[in-house]
């Protein structure tokens, strides 16, 4: 064991080093006397059966007379919560990209042979590892077939769907609500309040419309699956790419002849083209000076 990584109500997580394999592992240590011990066993079962790039790999489960040990992949990264708090907020493009990754993980779980609901999507349970999101802490996950009968509702305030507090049946749309709350958090820097505020500026309008479609109070009014939500976020990403690729016209105008306007325009065209932004120079009138300058600068 190297050091403690963290602890919570369900146990303590340590960083361990595998001497023979020369690799680090995360080891979750849970006392068998713990009231939530069954929750730990359930988490181990979920992780053992799930194989996805966004979910940690479980290598082994061991136990002795007093403790059980979950040995899993050690993830190095920054929590989504810490990332957003450090930056203040994320751009629509960055938030949509991470949102698509979240949708893929949740859709994988929701559409498994025995569907699983995560039920506690919140920024501290997501790690950003070199731009890739990894989902951690499966304490509250439930098989969809059992979720409606789950007596005690868990969830993080601001991210949990209303039905997690009212005792109504839970389904994949419960996780969709939380994805919307995460999108809100990423683009604002704070969790949504009891009445989320939406923006009407052009650059935010569609993104906030997507968030609203996730966080409707009635499940029937939300996106009906993480897959449907992912498709909508992908459409938004495609639109953002098209907008970024649109041609722009830059006008160079001089107050008098001979002050270097033509030279500056040609230089800018050359600079943009060499740096991956193809630029076309078009002059309002023809002069031999332009051709001479272009030849000297190597511009054809």
Predicted regions, residues:
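Conserved C-terminal C-lobe helix
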Residues: 202-217
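Activation-segment/catalytic-loop signature of the eukaryotic protein kinase fold
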Residues: 61
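Activation segment signature within eukaryotic-like protein kinase domains
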Residues: 98-99
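AlphaC helix of the protein kinase catalytic domain
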Residues: 80-90
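AlphaC helix of the eukaryotic protein kinase fold
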Residues: 31-49
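Conserved short submotifs of the Hanks-type protein kinase catalytic core
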Residues: 65-79
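Walker A/P-loop NTP-binding active-site region of P-loop NTPases
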Residues: 251-300
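Protein kinase catalytic-loop region centered on the HRD/HxD motif
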Residues: 104-116
């Amino acid at each position: 064991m190297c050091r403690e990584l963290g602890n919570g109500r369900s146990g303590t997580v340590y960083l361990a080093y595998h001497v023979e394999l020369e690799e680090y592992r995360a080891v979750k240590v849970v006392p068998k006397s713990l009231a939530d011990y069954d929750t730990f066993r359930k988490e181990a079962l979920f992780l053992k059966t799930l194989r996805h790039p966004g979910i940690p790999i479980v290598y082994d489960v061991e136990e002795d007379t007093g403790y059980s040990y979950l040995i899993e992949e050690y993830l190095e990264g920054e929590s989504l919560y810490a990332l957003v708090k450090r930056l203040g907020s994320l751009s629509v493009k960055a938030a949509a990209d991470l949102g698509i990754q979240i949708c893929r993980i949740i859709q994988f779980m929701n559409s498994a042979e025995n569907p699983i609901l995560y039920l506690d999507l919140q920024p501290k349970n997501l790690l950003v590892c070199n731009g890739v999101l990894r989902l951690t802490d499966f304490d509250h996950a439930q098989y969809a077939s059992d979720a409606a009968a789950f007596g005690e509702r868990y969830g993080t305030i601001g991210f949990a769907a209303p039905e997690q507090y009212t005792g109504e049946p839970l389904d994949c749309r419960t996780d969709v609500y939380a994805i919307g709350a995460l999108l809100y958090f990423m683009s604002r820097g704070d969790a949504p309040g009891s009445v989320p505020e939406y923006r009407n500026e052009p650059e935010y309008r569609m993104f906030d419309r997507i968030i609203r479609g996730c966080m409707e109070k009635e499940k029937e009014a939300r996106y009906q699956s993480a897959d449907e939500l992912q498709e909508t976020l992908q459409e938004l990403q495609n639109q953002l790419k098209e907008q970024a690729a649109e041609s722009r016209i830059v006008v160079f105008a001089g107050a008098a002849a001979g002050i270097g306007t033509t030279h500056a325009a040609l230089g800018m065209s050359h600079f943009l083209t060499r740096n991956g932004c193809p630029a076309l120079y078009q002059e309002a009138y023809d002069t031999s000076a332009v051709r001479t300058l272009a030849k000297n600068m190597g511009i054809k």
